[in-house]
Regions:
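Conserved, mostly hydrophobic/aromatic
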Residues: 148, 198, 226
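Active-site or pore-adjacent capping/gating segments
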Residues: 190, 201-235
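Short glycine/threonine-rich loop-to-helix capping motif typified by GTGT followed
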Residues: 89-98, 132-143, 171-185, 213-222
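K/E-rich alpha-helical interaction surfaces of small helical-bundle regulatory domains
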Residues: 142-154
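Catalytic alpha/beta active-site cores
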Residues: 1-131, 136-137, 155-158, 162-168, ...
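Histidine kinase transmitter module recognition
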Residues: 195-196, 229
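Short, acidic/polar
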Residues: 185-192
Length: 235
């Protein structure tokens, strides 16, 4: 208990009995939290930083998901199905959501074609949306959840846990102005409020100077302060 995986390297002398090591490793894999963003479809559609072909990347994504199922990795997301990059490339809120959900269902169909159980891989899927100041962003999360849960239940027969859509919000980089950058914190605060009132699972607030440079320590502290003040002082 309490021994991290990083301490369990192979040496000339056995540190722990093999069965104890195997149990610690299995427990760690079942509890560890994190996200693999590797969404190849948003790369093709928006970000364009593809290293591998779409077909090969999909196969790798499927391999990761199969490993997660085999090793009972239940709390780590195998993919972050990303609309943020699509929005940054110019999509409005409605188009962002449409492309992102379509990509999500593409992954579902592909994993099913490889013989995976939807109730085993459904909980490993997560989403990533942008929030701008357009009014549709006030409801993007709840609309996404309603569409996703209905399709997962009625089309694919998923259980309640696999029907749940978990999503991260990052405030819109595209909305930041290069002139009078100090006012960007106001834009980011409004976007953060949209996200919180729409019940996002996690939130990233952009630094006000990202329109012109790599964020500084001061601007990042201000971006973090937006979240902290909303969380601790609002309401």
């Amino acid at each position: 208990n309490g021994l991290g995986l990083m301490l369990l390297g192979v040496t000339g002398n056995e540190v722990l009995p093999a069965d104890v090591y195997a149990q610690i490793k299995a427990d760690a894999l079942s509890k560890v939290r994190g996200t693999v963003q590797a969404d190849i479809l948003k790369e093709d559609q928006a970000q364009n930083t593809c290293i591998f072909s779409t077909e090969f990347a999909l196969r790798l994504m499927g391999d990761v998901q199969e490993y997660f199922i085999e090793k009972n990795v239940r709390n780590f997301y195998s993919v972050s199905i990303s609309g943020y990059h699509i929005a940054e490339a110019g999509a409005n809120p409605i188009s962002q959501l449409a492309f992102t959900l379509a990509n999500g269902f593409t992954f579902v169909e592909y994993y099913l074609s490889r013989g995976m159980d939807i109730n085993k891989f459904g909980p490993n899927l997560s989403f990533f949306f942008s929030n701008g100041v357009d009014p549709e962003y006030a409801v993007i999360g709840r609309v996404a959840r309603k569409i996703w849960s209905k399709a997962m239940k009625m089309k694919y027969g998923a259980d309640p846990r696999a029907q749940m859509l978990k999503y991260h919000i990052q405030t819109s980089g595209r909305s930041l102005h290069a002139q009078e950058i100090d006012f960007n914190d106001i834009r980011t605060t409004l976007q953060a409020l949209y996200a919180i009132y729409d019940n996002c699972n996690s939130l990233h607030t952009n630094a006000y100077d990202e329109a012109i440079t790599t964020p500084t320590e001061e601007s990042v502290r201000r971006a973090m302060a937006i979240q902290l003040i909303i969380n601790k002082e609002l309401g």
